[in-house]
Structures are given as structure tokens and as C-alpha cells.
Curated annotation (Swiss-Prot):
The active site is at residue 105. The keyword Nucleotidyltransferase applies. This is Pol polyprotein. The keyword Thylakoid does not apply. It catalyses: Endohydrolysis of RNA in RNA/DNA hybrids. Three different cleavage modes: 1. sequence-specific internal cleavage of RNA. Human immunodeficiency virus type 1 and Moloney murine leukemia virus enzymes prefer to cleave the RNA strand one nucleotide away from the RNA-DNA junction. 2. RNA 5'-end directed cleavage 13-19 nucleotides from the RNA end. 3. DNA 3'-end directed cleavage 15-20 nucleotides away from the primer terminus; 3'-end directed exonucleolytic cleavage of viral RNA-DNA hybrid; DNA(n) + a 2'-deoxyribonucleoside 5'-triphosphate = DNA(n+1) + diphosphate. Residues 616-739 form the RNase H type-1 domain. Residues 1095-1143 bind DNA. Zn(2+) binds at residues 886, 890, 914, 917. Its EC number is 3.4.23.-, 2.7.7.49, 3.1.26.13, 3.1.13.2. Transmembrane segments: none annotated.
Amino acid sequence: TAWTFLKAMQKCSKKREARGSREAPETNFPDTTEESAQQICCTRDSSDSKSVPRSERNKKGIQCQGEGSSRGSQPGQFVGVTYNLEKRPTTIVLINDTPLNVLLDTGADTSVLTTAHYNRLKYRGRKYQGTGIIGVGGNVETFSTPVTIKKKGRHIKTRMLVADIPVTILGRDILQDLGAKLVLAQLSKEIKFRKIELKEGTMGPKIPQWPLTKEKLEGAKETVQRLLSEGKISEASDNNPYNSPIFVIKKRSGKWRLLQDLRELNKTVQVGTEISRGLPHPGGLIKCKHMTVLDIGDAYFTIPLDPEFRPYTAFTIPSINHQEPDKRYVWKCLPQGFVLSPYIYQKTLQEILQPFRERYPEVQLYQYMDDLFVGSNGSKKQHKELIIELRAILQKGFETPDDKLQEVPPYSWLGYQLCPENWKVQKMQLDMVKNPTLNDVQKLMGNITWMSSGVPGLTVKHIAATTKGCLELNQKVIWTEEAQKELEENNEKIKNAQGLQYYNPEEEMLCEVEITKNYEATYVIKQSQGILWAGKKIMKANKGWSTVKNLMLLLQHVATESITRVGKCPTFKVPFTKEQVMWEMQKGWYYSWLPEIVYTHQVVHDDWRMKLVEEPTSGITIYTDGGKQNGEGIAAYVTSNGRTKQKRLGPVTHQVAERMAIQMALEDTRDKQVNIVTDSYYCWKNITEGLGLEGPQNPWWPIIQNIREKEIVYFAWVPGHKGIYGNQLADEAAKIKEEIMLAYQGTQIKEKRDEDAGFDLCVPYDIMIPVSDTKIIPTDVKIQVPPNSFGWVTGKSSMAKQGLLINGGIIDEGYTGEIQVICTNIGKSNIKLIEGQKFAQLIILQHHSNSRQPWDENKISQRGDKGFGSTGVFWVENIQEAQDEHENWHTSPKILARNYKIPLTVAKQITQECPHCTKQGSGPAGCVMRSPNHWQADCTHLDNKIILHFVESNSGYIHATLLSKENALCTSLAILEWARLFSPKSLHTDNGTNFVAEPVVNLLKFLKIAHTTGIPYHPESQGIVERANRTLKEKIQSHRDNTQTLEAALQLALITCNKGRESMGGQTPWEVFITNQAQVIHEKLLLQQAQSSKKFCFYKIPGEHDWKGPTRVLWKGDGAVVVNDEGKGIIAVPLTRTKLLIKPN
């Protein structure tokens, strides 16, 4: 062997004996109370190593330390050490409680103890006859003796030979008992690395390592030592500034797995086009006699990483309580989680397999990640090709484990079960837990969707319905009986599923499409030998798509799928007629092409659409309308021959009333040709384009049934309240006409003439009202206000001319007392009222409590402001200006549509044609605090320069500046500039050294700006500024071609971000920010004015019966006043619920 040197010479020098028997220092004595694992590592050279990790069957082993090892073992280590074969791999073990330095020799069959070491043993056993061994000089005499070997808590009792040799040898007999195993390092030198580059202007990640628990830290150290000994990682250099955090998880087997968070590194890497766009499908395989499926083990660990890129993959192993300095490592092979690892691996393996593909073009060789499928005809040829395949892989360093080599059917491949005659989806039982969450249901739906290609007829309609309204993954869903029944039916179909067939390129394919009772479209791809594959698609009724439209789009999906798998488009057999297809094609501008179709019969519930025509008929015309009045829905219609009908519907929505009006008109009309005119765009759009999947349980079903009974029906839509005569009649017919009857008593109330409104109130006795005086005039009048009405006491014009102001106010339904009238003389002379004189009036009005919506200042109408009949294409003239605007400032589509009055679809098309804006994506989502004058700040790097940017959380307004250095002084100057321009109240940053520095903290305290810090890169603390960081960089890159310096590009990018993209409510961040600041100033002025206000009022809050006040009026408008309520603070109260008065004494 490589390390057994035996001599027959009897003389041994004392110097050699001393060398063979020397003891290790006390600090390196093995800890016999601690359990660990043994690993013997042998390297072919200084960079490529072989290792012996602990045995799988022995979880406890020994730890070894070599005399010339490149890294010695330390107490507490769990795996072995890498040895450089330029020196002997030695370690210290306890033999009969005597520490001895021994040589690890994996080539020696038997362990041999030197005579010198035997004489040094603390206690020696009997001598037995030994077996002769042959050395360099001939036979060597030996004898055997019983020994006890201890290493790291492992005790072994055995016999060792004793001979006069240079060094004690531990051979395979003892190493095996200690749990040692020889493993070659998997990093191949035969494979050339691929060059990896960072994006221009980016830097590697510098994310600090987060703390790890003691258990996970031990697991990380164990895994790192194993990777280090196998040559997959190496120590990082001292000048490496990069770092990506790691974490470890425990697998089901109990072993630890080390993972690294490389998301930030992935953002900086130049990524090419995806070369693996999907999984191969067994339905596209050509039938063959013999198959072989093999797996490539540790694929990523076989391919070396670009040496120049390795520093960017650095990671850190910390210690508990900072017991020792951190240890840092870098990857030498492709790391898991790296964005380019799949691409490099697949591209490398593709190049290795390319000579085989060219040599045997008739063999089916499928490569997906580490799974390979080989199919051919003829057993000998198959075997020969398999050997060539294995050699092509092994000579490059890849491994194909024997336990994963499948040469006997059935073969497991990518979740499928393959046999020479047919294929199946690997069977699984679909189960659901007792109280499922949204995550459980989504997993179940994913399994059903996966299995639907191999098990025709699987459905998810009722299962998917249980997830409606659920947003959180851990939210409990209501598992219905329909869903359970559907699950049981699917399990029965899976249980009885038959094997599907392979593709025959000599025959044509047929796709049969059907619609289930749950309105799911299912399809199967067939040939004469049977079904190749199947699929399903839930029809999108919620998008207003008809059945024909759903199915025609399904045909394009299946055709694309078929071309992808076998390179051909099948012939389709569909359940609708040619007339229906042609009718849909007239309106279906979205169809790119139409495949060859075999028509069978009409589709379910869709024949009524053929009755709808595009031109008016010669039949009767009916104008329909629906609405709400006093909370009650009303449906009505007016016919062209003068007939009118009205129907009260109770508490329904406005849209339901419009639909019921159309239904009522169709039901009452016996004519076979009908014209229906409605002002409800909702109803017209649904009937002409949106329906088609309705059943008897759907509210639209009666309308569909009535249309079926007609010959032809024409539906038209007109805008409401535009002076169209028929629509006006229908609108009047939908109104409830009724008289308001008032019950009253008293002598001071008089009825008016029939043409006048309300009642007059009279003076009970003579009264003199001095100038600027206010008097309350009582009357004996009592009234009972009708339901949904209120009484309004107001003045008369004849009294107003004299300067008499009446502050009577509102009388609610519940008020039954006498009416009192508050009068104020605002004239220049005294006013005398005579008994019986009419001085005020009482008017009874209906009360409407409709909710009010905020006015939309940004609402865009393509019609313009000229009203009905003014539609044109005037916005076409603005397209060029909008294109120029976007080219200069990269403005968002909504802002373009608002500023240039063009349709949003046109604005989106302008944006999509921009090469810079099409690269943008959405930022990471998070939940952060948003409020006016609350800012977030962060530093970012671009073109080796530092950009400090501030983002106002409420509006998204960005302020940015360049820093010469990322230190406290430069940051403080930038904060002073920011505070001078704005009025910030609070600032949130990460824990960067420049933000937590004492000068910066003291400056923010001096400016009275609340400062908080959060975890860097955490979406719940830095979400807004991280998204702004990404947006700002993208806009800077958009302007770099037109600028000479980064400073100029930054300023242009700020204009684009703040004034060229939409924020809340469709406004730009600048508009939202200015509006907020103006509102703050307005509120301050309002409070200042309130202090000097002389107006007071009584007021009543909606929903409460008692009047409150008198209180100061903070502000009075045309329809409301603002007061400071004790319970609710500053609120607005409608004028109808207030009684204004002069400041009380």
C-alpha cells in the first residue's frame, strides 16, 4: 500500500523509536467523553481531495488529527479533517489508555503495533501467535496481543499484531470498526467553469449573518466541516468584504442541511434567457421496447464555480457569545439557491451529452435537471448505448448511483410511472385534514391539477369554491359537502385509472372537448391506440366570457400544448355548431387563428345567443328602467304603444331593479320580435356579451328563457338622463308618486293656496323686537310628521324685507311638542309683530338618506365634456405629444391618460413600446406604517457612488442626494438639507453605521424628528424605501443615455418618480405630498380662526336623537358646518341638522 513500509531489519535506532512513540501535546489529547464522527481524507494534490466521512451505519465515531494535516482537529469537532498527502495522515488514539501517534492507512488490511509502542503500553496482555507479514527486506516476525482502542468515546476491543516496524498502522480492520469511510471529493477538474459576471454598477452582497441557536450552530459547523473536507468550500480570504447569511434545517432523517440566502446576490448577477421552459411529458414520448431511467447524484457539487466569482458567495459561521472570531468560507462549486446554478448545470450536461445525441439520433434521450431517460428498440443496442452514456458522464466527474439506476419496469420519472406499453401518473390518495386551511386546499388543488393530465375527468370546481374570500394561508376554510363529494369522486377515478399511451408519429391526433355539469371544460388527446394525455380548464364565467369564447380560447391553449409536446396540432371535436363559431368570430378580435374543427352539437345553455341581433327589429320597442326610492326598489317599463307598468321590489340594489325591469318587459310581451332599450350599461353588457354559463339557479336564467321563446331580440343601451324621450318616460314611470299628508292641531297654523307649498305660522300676540335682539315666539301648533319626512320652519319674503331673520330649524318625525320660532331682528329699526300676522312658514319635505361618495377629480371620460352624441377621436391628435412626454420622462400610463385625455389602453401601449419601462417589475410586498410627514431613508450604490434617498411614506415622494462618503458627517449635512426643504416629523432607517452614529442621532433629536431603526432588508420595516430604491435606479438608467453625469440623471429621475408616475388615487406623488401639506396648513388656520369665531349652533349627530350645544362653529360652508364634538372631535354636520344662533350670553 501507499503507506505500509515494513522492514525485516532487526535494528531500530533510538531516534526512530522516539519518533514513532512520541506523544501529542496535552492540549490536543482526545476527549474520550465526547462522541463524534471519524473522517479520513486523502488528497490527490493540494486542491483536489479525497475524504473518509463517518459511516452511515455508525453515528458515533472518532476524530483524527494528523501530524502534517493542513487543518488539525479541535475539541468539539464532529467530522474529520482534510489531509494533504505530501505528509503522513496521522492522529492520536488511546491504546490500552496510552496516547499514541498512529498512521491511518486505508490500504493496509491489518493493523500493526510497533514494538516501541507495545513496550510503552500502560498494561499489556498475553502474547499469541501472530501471522507473518512481508516487508521490504522479507518476512517479519509478529505476535498478536489483545488491546482496547479508544477515540472520542468509541471503545473497541480487538487484537493487533506487534512487529518491529517504523510506525504503528491502523488498517482497514480497525478503521471500519471506528466508522471510517473513504469518499472521493466530487468537484471535477475535467469540467471547465463558466464565466459569471455582475451587472454593471452593482456590488456583491454585504448582509451580516444573523444569530443561530446553539443546536443549529452545531449543525452548521458539522455540515461546513464535511463540505470543507470534500473540497466543496474553502476558507475565505482576509480581504473578502462580501457575505450572505446562512441558516440550517433538520431533515426527516435527522441530518442537518445548510442553506444560504443568496437573494441579494441573485439580484446583482447578469442572467441570460431561461433554457428549460417546462417539464417533458410522457404523452410526447415515442413508444419503445426498452427504457432506462438514471439519476445524477450531487450534480451541483460536481461543477466548479468561476474562481473570480467565488468571493461573492462568502458566508460566516458565528459563535455563541462571540467566544471566538467568526469563520468565513466561500463556495468552490455551484451553491444551492444561486440563480445561475440550474442554467450552468443543465448547459454543462447538455454539452457533455451532445456527442451521444449526434452519434445515436434514433435514441430518445431526455434530460431534465438530474433525471435522464433513455429509450430505444433492441436490448443489446440499449445496453451498449447505456454503457456509453455512463462513460460519457463518469469521465467528466459525474456520479450515477446504482441505487437510482432503473433498468426494470415500472420506471419512476418526473412524477410519472412508465412501462414499455403505457404510462400513468404515480398514484396518490387525495386526502383532506379535518379543519383545512387555505394552504391545505391549495396543495390539494395543485395535486389534482397535476394528476389531471394522466387521469381524465378530475374536477376542482367545488373544492376551489371553498377558498373564496380567503386571503391568509393559515385561514380556516369551510369544507362543504359538495367539496367532499367531489374529492371522493376524484379518488374513485384515480383508483380506476387506466394506463395512457405513447405517441405514434405515423398517425393523426384527435382532441375531444366536453363540458362537465360544473362548467369545467375537459379534453383528451387521442390516437388509435388510446388516450395520450388529458387536461381540464375552469371556464371563466366571472370575467363575462361566453361558453363559446371559453372553449375557443381553450382550443388555442390545447393546440399550443400539443405543438410543444409532439410538434403537431390535433383535429378538434367540439360540442358546438359552426354557426356559433362564426358568430363568435365576428366579435372575437382576440382569436389569433382557428384550428381544424369537427362540429358535433350545440353547447349547453348557449343557443339563446343566436337570437340576439345587431340591428333593430320591426317589432315593439320597450324602454326599461329601474331604481330605488326611499330604500325600495322599483322596476318599470314603457312600450312604444303607450303601455306603462311599475312594480315595487322591496329592498334590492339598483342593478337588480334594472334587471327585473328587463325581465318584466320580456315576460309581458307576446311579440316574437322585440326591441329592448335600457340605460343600464351593466345589464346591456351582461346580456350581449357576458352570459353563457348560467343554470336554472342563476338570477339571469328567466331572461335567458324568455329570449329563447322569441324569434329575434335587439338590445340597445342609451345613457340615462340625456333627454331621450323614451328613456325619460321610463324614468318617470319608475318613480313613486304619492301625496304627503300632515296631521296638525292649533290655531296659529293656516293652510295656503293649492299652488303654494306648506303652511303659514301666525303670531300668537303682539310682539316688539328691538334691533339685534332675538326672541323665541311660541305657538300652539303641534304636528305629526309623516314617515320618511321632516318639517322645515323658515321665513317669509315679506318679513325678510323688514330684516326679520327666522331661525326655526328642522322638525323630525319623533317631535310632538309645540312649535317655537326663533326670530332675530337684523334690520336697522325695531319690528312690531301683530297678533294673527303671518310671519313664518312650515314646509314638509321627504327625507333621503342616500350615502355620499367622494368627488373623483381624476375621472376621465373618453367622450369629453360635450355630453351625449359628442363621441369622437379627438384624442388621436394627442398621441404624439404623449409619446414625446414618455420618451423624455418615462411617465406612467395613468398619468399620460389623465394629462393628454387619451384612453388608458393607448397609454399602456405607449409604455410597453419603451425598452426601459418594459423591464420594470413589482417590488417586494410588505406591511409598513404610512402617514404624512413620516419618511424612510436608505443609502444605495450606483456607478461606485453613494445615493442617500428619503421617501415620504404617505405619498411616495422621493428626495435624493449624492454623498461623497457614507459617514456620519456627510449624512448629517444631507439630513439638514432635507429638513430645510420639508417638515418631517419622523424618520425610519436601517441599522447602518452612518444612521446610528451619535452625531446623526443627536442631530435628529435637535430637529425634533423621531428616529426609529429596523432590520435591514426586512419588508415590514424597509418596504417603502426598498421599492423606491429599485424604482429610482431604473429611472436613472433610463436617463443615462441622454446625460453626461450621474448627478444629472439623478435629478431627471427624481422628476420622473415624483411627477411622472401615479401614486394614491391616480395622483402623482408630488400632488399627493403638496395636497397633504396644504391640508395641514389649512387645519392650522382653521383652528386659529375658530378661536375668534362668533358663530354658535345647536347640532344633532346622525343616528342620535338629542340636540347638542350650543357650541362654537369652527367653519361654515354651503352645506355643512364644522364643530368640535366632545366625544368625536372635529366633525362636519349637515346644515339640515344644525340651528345657528348668536353667541349666547
